[in-house]
């Protein structure tokens, strides 16, 4: 559903941003 999609997208976003900040 929408909530599940938003949740997975949020987790991906956090991992993506975290990877950039850790470089």
Swiss-Prot record:
Cited function: Antimicrobial peptide.
GO biological process: defense response
UniProt KW Cytoplasm keyword: no
UniProt name for this protein: Magainin-R2
Keyword terms: Amphibian defense peptide, Antimicrobial, Secreted
Tissue distribution: Expressed by the skin glands.
Subcellular location: Secreted
Organism the protein comes from: Xenopus ruwenzoriensis (Uganda clawed frog)
Homology family: Belongs to the gastrin/cholecystokinin family. Magainin subfamily.
One GO CC term on file: extracellular region
